[in-house]
Regions:
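Histidine-centered active-site/metal-ligand motif
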Residues: 30-33, 41, 60, 76
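N-terminal/domain-start segments enriched in small and hydrophobic, helix-friendly residues
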Residues: 1-5, 10, 48, 66, ...
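A short interface-forming secondary-structure element
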Residues: 38, 46-57
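A generic structural signal for short beta-strands and their flanking turns/coil linkers
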Residues: 17-19, 38-42, 74-78
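Solvent-exposed beta-strand sheet faces enriched in polar/charged residues
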Residues: 24, 45-47, 81-83
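N-terminal first-folded block
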Residues: 2-35
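C-terminal structural segments of small proteins and small subunits
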Residues: 54-88
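Residues within mature, well-folded domains
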Residues: 29, 49, 85-87
């Protein structure tokens, strides 16, 4: 079963308790791209206190850790914008 944006949103909400969360399926923008056959492309905008004091790489690691069980199920690409609530 293919991963949906709802699957991603649920996993991130449970792991990081974000104050803002937007998940967009960008797969249609990559039609014909070799990786599009093997998985889907998503963009995530997330604001969470869990990111406070962390560098961008550590923030992205938290997001990837939260999605670890979904990654092998069909996420080919993930664009991440991770901030604290007061950084927006």
């Amino acid at each position: 079963m293919a991963v949906t944006r709802e699957d991603i949103a649920s996993a991130l909400a449970q792991a990081l308790a974000p104050s803002r969360l937007e998940v967009q399926d960008d797969s249609h923008l990559h039609a014909g791209h070799a990786g599009a056959r093997e998985g889907r492309h998503f963009s995530v905008r997330i604001d969470a206190e869990a990111f406070r004091g962390l560098a961008r790489v550590r923030r992205h690691r938290l997001v990837y850790d939260a999605l670890a069980s979904l990654m092998p199920q069909g996420i080919h690409a993930l664009a991440i914008d991770a901030r604290t609530p007061d950084e927006r």
